């Protein structure tokens, strides 16, 4: 058979084999086009599981009459124009293949009107050459796409369609995923003339949990822990279910989005699973709805025919970022049981962590339990006090316990003979537990502090080094080891290998786990403060240091590591300085009482004040 150019219809049908797998694939492509057009309302009508009819109507910007024919042509799109656009894609579609592929295996009709046009126009393609016919029509601003008799001209594909119920369930799942991605869009889904789903838009700043509950169910909502995590250009937000209460049914909720695009990414799933593995059984899976925002230049979405997968340019960074974000919210959720007193005490009141550097010292207040990760709290009844926004919401509770908790909260506390008040320091004395208030950043790495009218300078890199040393030094329990996604394998000499074997127990207390063979050592886990470090530089230097030692004390090794860690902040900001000082005050109180000279230096203002007065 000679080489020949395939007819347009056959070429489109071949492309449809990748894009149009089943009716749900058609719905996904068309709804994503509506979202790219700026629609705020999308109505989806399905008949016979999508095999008979798929109708998508939106109120987006519409398509101009002159561009209708192009819209049904292959490789025609308004979303990209150059390679630079492709490498930083932010729209859901970009290849320009969907409409041409769908129209080649169905009877597709496209009706659209823009705000500038007085009338709407309708286009459809037919025949071997896919000639497009355009005619006037009646239609509001927006677009309607009707897909009739899917796979009518490809009997083999139609034969592989499942039952009407199964195909509609796939469509329903696609709409659920899209509705979770765009809370600002109203989506209505009907099947055989009956409304099945109505997802109302959530206004900016509104309660997204209401829609989350409508999609994922109240069981997920009651166990959902809210996540807000950011590092540089990476942002992670959403919800992860408490692993201690995750059921097999709940574990079916696994939705992940990258820049608003729904994904099935093994790297992301691995990071989440690894963060939850201590609380999940071997055969359990986590439940989550997570949104990852990343610089579009750092992710390639053009790696899968149906755009279900992406490739990250810095996959290790993304994995560790997600792992730490999920792990942090799970660690906040853990509560250490408090010893029971002989007499009942008032319920603990969660307060934010210490931020004396910003102007207030919460450590001067009565001790309370640590706040847990935020969960969803149901909205109050009409006329009651509004519930707090979810970042500050109280822990969720099981339905059967709700009434009991409500009664307990409404029951007045029994009268008790007041205890003699214990002597307490006045509130101002709490300043002894803090460095003071951050006024500004000087020379990019020093914080100018004010305390009791005195001014001092604090070296932020030195404070960070002290904090890292405390975080690395094992207490009653060893430092928690964080497994590396890609273990680090290094070649070592006989002397270095011998030193590592002698220091193995001390390194294990610091959270550093390794395996050694004849001439190599493989680092399998490191403590959390080392996750963002360049381990290919730090670990060889650490091995060289150990080879020169005769005694291996965890404290000395932790001190050496802390002194050799690279700071994550070349230019310190006020927020970073405040956060650092709060952590140092909490974990290193001895530094506040007796700060070393290399950390804190007082600034004498008297000569300057005297000079001003003399003038």
Curated annotation (Swiss-Prot):
PROSITE patterns: DNA_MISMATCH_REPAIR_1. Residues 363-397 are annotated as: Disordered. Coiled coil: none annotated. It comes from the Bacteria. Keywords: DNA damage, DNA repair. GO terms for cellular component: mismatch repair complex. InterPro entries: DNA_mismatch_repair_CS, DNA_mismatch_repair_MutL, DNA_mismatch_S5_2-like, HATPase_C_sf, MutL/Mlh/PMS, MutL/Mlh/Pms-like, MutL_C, MutL_C_dimsub. One of its GO terms (molecular function) is ATP binding. Residues 378-391 have a biased composition (Low complexity). Pfam families: DNA_mis_repair, HATPase_c_3, MutL_C. One of its GO terms (biological process) is mismatch repair. This protein is involved in the repair of mismatches in DNA. It is required for dam-dependent methyl-directed DNA mismatch repair. May act as a 'molecular matchmaker', a protein that promotes the formation of a stable complex between two or more DNA-binding proteins in an ATP-dependent manner without itself being part of a final effector complex. Belongs to the DNA mismatch repair MutL/HexB family. This is DNA mismatch repair protein MutL. It comes from Escherichia coli O157:H7. The gene is mutL.
